[in-house]
């Protein structure tokens, strides 16, 4: 059995607080029931999944998509997110539950905090230094790609401030 969580659910991830939490990915086949848990640093269970849905596929050898649901959680962390069945376990470390902000747009959303060589942002260096005081701030950048079909995952990871 092999679980693969979507890249958004990697080490250092931030999950939205006070809202139902959904975790998804794919698996080859499942031995028993899929169970997911959120554990604190002392391995105490903070939350256990309340529902798991498996996609029905015609080809029995094709990977199946799964969706795991947790009840809303308060802000906190760092946690470990474990997804397992009777045969294997996948663990994601340094997971926080907090505020998730999504910024999207066109080329203007790619401008770095410091600006560009001939278009600097006033006070940027001070803001960048200040961000280092808050290691819980995370950033997940979805790389640009062109595709004729919907893309379900991307090859990237969470970064600390």
Named regions from a protein language model:
Residues 1-161:
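Cell-envelope and extracellular/periplasmic
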């Amino acid at each position: 059995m092999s679980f693969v969580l979507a890249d958004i659910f990697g080490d250092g991830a931030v999950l939205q607080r006070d809202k139902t939490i959904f975790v998804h990915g794919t698996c080859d086949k499942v031995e028993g029931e899929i169970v997911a848990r959120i554990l604190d640093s002392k391995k105490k269970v903070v939350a256990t999944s309340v529902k798991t849905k498996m996609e029905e596929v015609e080809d029995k050898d094709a990977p199946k998509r799964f969706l795991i649901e947790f009840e809303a959680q308060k802000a906190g962390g760092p946690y470990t997110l474990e997804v397992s069945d009777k045969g294997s376990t996948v663990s994601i470390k340094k997971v926080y539950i907090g505020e998730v902000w999504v910024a999207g747009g066109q080329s203007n959303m790619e401008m770095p905090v410091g600006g560009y060589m001939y278009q600097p942002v006033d006070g940027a260096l001070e803001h960048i230094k200040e961000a280092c005081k808050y290691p819980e701030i995370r950033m997940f950048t979805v790389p640009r790609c062109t595709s004729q079909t919907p893309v379900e995952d991307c090859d990237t990871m969470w970064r600390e401030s």
